């Protein structure tokens, strides 16, 4: 296992340089057998950080360019006697027993590692039948543990309160950047998580496209679209939700469209139950919008979410996913529509699947502001 997200998911440990660089040469987690302890290759400079943090992990460090020394070496001016080994050298040592026996299966995150790394793997392990295990992690991460559910409750609380605070500053003359700064400041003030770097807000025609916040000034006829979240830094968990608001003089067509999207999204959430097919959930929302907007097109109406780095993960709510909804999944249920040059919407909430249906986690921030017109 080479990705920092999945190393953390399995061990609770976060290799620093692997996380910063996303270079698989910095660390690897080896799982030989379910009855054996996992082995983590670490930098010599970081090994002490992980000691005693997880008794189920064996640490095996490699020498780096850092030049780490102990006190005796400094006092006695001892020449270094390094056994220079890389992370991959250590992995090779631990897997040599399999190479000696002939053909065997070797699971590896092919979706994460680089082309040069995989070529090196093939050279070092010529008898290995490489199997991509990337999807196994995404599927495992789709159903949350009780501890993970609480993590998401905390994260959504922080993001929701931040957006609620931001909503109080919506007024004519405010800039996109300034409004987003309110959201970020609230999260920083709380201190538990960080605002997701990709978080965006757009006014008017900017609400219909993927863009960074600008100096655009809010006018009384604008649509407003927020899309963002928070993340748990080196614990990796991330969130994703959206709000779309309309200023008092917004075009009546925008008012009508928002109501259509909102009602469809709310109906989807109310219909969620354990055992329901994702394709059925998609069709429910999609067909409801289509009744009023016959040319509505959309590839999916939501997704799972966990440790990232991407926010949209399996299972996706689309017409082709016939897998079923499971208890303790956390889903982002969204019904967007973007109209180029006119305005855009994304009605999105984070929900927890319960044995009785769905609990909306992002319930604190409003879908409608007090001054908004309703159909």
Regions found by a protein language model. Give the residues of each.
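Active-site neighborhoods and metal-handling regions in enzymes and metal-associated proteins
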Residues: 1-375
